Swiss-Prot record:
Protein name from the UniProt record: Replication protein E1
HAMAP family: PPV_E1
Primary localization: host cell
Enzyme class: isomerase
PTM info: Phosphorylated. Sumoylated.
Source lineage: Viruses, Monodnaviria, Shotokuvirae, Cossaviricota, Papovaviricetes
Cellular compartments annotated: Host nucleus
Residues that bear Phosphoserine: S81, S89
Comp. bias intervals (Polar residues): 591-604
Annotated keywords: ATP-binding, DNA replication, DNA-binding, Early protein, Helicase, Host nucleus, Hydrolase, Isomerase, Isopeptide bond, Nucleotide-binding, Phosphoprotein, Ubl conjugation
Region (Disordered) location: 579-604
Originating organism: Human papillomavirus 12
Length: 604
């Protein structure tokens, strides 16, 4: 009999029911279930230790970098390699001596953090196809198509922004930026005139700058072609490059990298014609009158004929009238006249400026010396005190002499003989202790009368007395024993008022009489028997008291040019000085000295 299919109900064969799961109320408590079920057929299936972040993030970062680098190399092979040389220079391949192959030095660069690589990629040149057209850009001034493509990306990605701007400037204006300007390397150097080339200026800001700059400038020249805008600004006050950049960046809302700035060429006729001709066109905006450096080179006038020839006599006349005797003063002051004086402009353009300055100084000294010799002492004093400006009081000198216990009447009598160079009375000695005001008193007199000072330190030279032949009055300050010995030995005839032979440099000895000679010393020569032969030749006055000072450390007695001017005017008659109206012939007025070749009645 075949076995029946299915299960059987016999109890002896139903052991599987014993293995069934037991029901419990805790069947949903998974945490308790897992805690109780510790028996497992798989060992160490679960790790109950603390979790740690491995290096999976670093691995992911490396994989991303490798993928980015691979994509970048593919793009560089596709776009940059065929145009690397063309972007550097279109003519580089034709003049290259190396094989015609592209440089791939940086094409397969080593792996890096990615920062430097990204910066290098941004610095690469971009092909002309990658251009962003400007929206509402300005129309081309001369025959343009109207719409202009402004290559913003080429400027941002260029490794040499200045070279890129200069190339775009030359492309727009047809002339190099350096052909119109001279270079200032320092940012702190000030200049009144500046040439600015600004890239990618917004139209509204471009138009507003024409009005805003008028308050800062005397002359404005503005023109925009394409993306480039050219400014010529003549500021009212000198500005350095940093100040100009700060002004333009705030006014035009541009970055400093978008600006080229240099001062213009002032002596270049071609550059001046560029500004002059450009300002006459309709595309340029100008405000104000032409600056002098443009007008002088482009505008013809009667000044051009005068400036072409240098008149040496006019330079000598100018130096004589202004009392310039030294070469540095003549050169500097005459150069300052160049903007107004056409003869000074011609002198600056001459290649023998130093020669003319030396000859001018020599001629002025000759004229001044001849004029001095022709004048009497009265006329000389009158001329010099008239040159003093301001007013003083003669009582300061009188009070100082009385403070030093000097009899003013005696001093006035000796001073009168001193000024007239009376024989054996033409030398006055002021002696006394130190800090008594001897040198201050003597120097103030020499200063107002434009006298000369002798220094015994030069006594080793045989020409140390030469200033005595070139002055109306002289001073020998701080005479010591060696100097007294020299005077007692060699200068007795000069103090007597006789002619002496004076050795002068670069000429034969000349015959002169000593001018009035003023001495200061700490030694009373009248109390020294060794110098008894000088007692009758020198009139001495003692200053025994220290020079008085105010609490603010200023002199109590004002020994100034104004005080001496008042002194001579007040005591002119007592000093027996002649009336100036009687100096001329029959009261006729004397006209000013003229040493120029121009006639007196010539038209100005």
């Amino acid at each position: 009999m075949a076995d029946s299919k299915g299960s059987t109900s016999k109890e002896g064969l139903s052991d599987w029911c014993i293995l069934e799961a037991e029901c419990s109320d805790l069947e949903n408590d998974f945490e308790q279930l897992f805690e109780q079920d510790t028996d497992s057929d798989v060992s160490d299936l679960l790790d109950n230790g603390e979790l740690e972040q491995g290096n999976s993030l670093e691995l992911f970062h490396q994989q991303e970098c490798e993928q980015s680098e691979e994509q970048l190399q593919i793009l560089k092979r596709k776009y940059l390699s065929p145009k690397a040389v063309a972007q550097l220079s279109p003519r580089l391949e034709s003049i290259s001596l190396s094989p015609q192959q592209k440089s791939k030095r940086r094409l397969f660069a080593e792996q890096d953090s990615g920062l430097e690589l990204s910066l290098n990629n941004e610095a690469e040149d971009v092909s002309p196809e990658v251009e962003v057209p400007a929206i509402d850009s300005r129309p081309v001034d001369e025959g343009g198509s109207g719409a202009i493509d402004i290559d913003y990306l080429s400027l941002l990605r260029s490794s040499n922004i200045k070279a890129t701007l200069m190339a775009k400037f030359k492309e727009s204006f047809g002339v190099g930026f350096n052909e119109l300007t001279r270079q200032f390397k320092s940012y702190k150097t000030c200049c009144n005139d500046w040439v600015l080339a600004v890239y990618a200026v917004h139209d509204d800001l471009f138009e507003s700058s024409k009005q805003l700059l008028q308050q800062h400038c005397d002359y404005i020249w503005v023109r925009g072609i394409g993306a480039m805008t050219l400014y010529l600004l003549c500021f009212k006050a000198g500005k350095n490059r940093g100040t100009v950049h700060k002004l333009m960046t705030s006014m035009l809302n541009v970055q400093e990298q978008q600006i080229l700035s240099e001062p213009p060429k002032l002596r270049n006729t071609a550059a001046a014609l560029f500004w002059y001709k450009g300002g006459m066109g309709s595309g340029a905006f100008t405000h104000g009158t032409y600056p002098d450096w443009i007008a002088h080179q482009t505008i013809l006038g009667h000044q051009n004929a005068e400036a072409s020839t240098f008149d040496f006599s006019a330079m000598v006349q100018w130096a004589f009238d202004n009392n310039y005797l030294e070469e540095p003063d003549i050169a500097y002051q005459y150069a300052k006249l160049a903007p107004e004086d056409s003869n000074a402009v011609a002198w600056l353009a001459h290649n023998q400026q130093a020669k003319f300055v030396r000859e001018c100084a020599a001629m002025v000294r000759f004229y001044k010396k001849g004029q001095m010799k022709e004048m009497s002492m009265s006329e000389w004093i009158h001329t010099k005190i008239n040159e003093v400006e301001g007013e003083g009081h003669w009582s300061d000198i009188v009070k100082f002499l009385r403070y030093q216990d000097v009899n003013f009447i005696t001093f006035l009598a000796a001073f009168k003989n001193f000024l007239h160079a009376v024989p054996k009375h033409n030398c006055i000695l002021i002696y006394g202790p130190p800090n008594s005001g001897k040198s201050s008193f003597a120097m103030s007199l020499i200063k107002v009368l434009k006298g000369r000072v002798l220094s015994f330190v030069n006594s080793k030279s045989q020409f140390w007395l030469q200033p005595l032949g070139e002055s109306k009055i002289a001073l020998l300050d701080d005479v010591t024993d060696p100097c007294w010995v020299y005077i007692d030995t060699y200068l007795r005839n000069g103090l007597d008022g006789h002619f002496v032979s004076l050795d002068c440099k670069y000429k034969a000895p000349v015959q002169i009489k000593f001018p009035p000679l003023l001495l200061t010393s700490n030694i009373n020569v009248h109390g020294e028997t060794n110098y008894r032969y000088l007692h009758s030749r020198i009139k001495g006055f003692e200053f025994p008291h220290p020079f008085p000072m105010k609490p603010d450390n200023t002199p109590q007695f004002q020994l100034t040019d104004q005080s001496w001017k008042s002194f001579f005017e007040r005591l002119w008659t007592q000093l027996d000085l002649s009336d100036q109206e009687e100096e001329g012939q029959h009261g006729e007025s004397q006209r000013a000295f003229q040493c120029s070749a121009r006639s007196a009645n010539e038209h100005i």
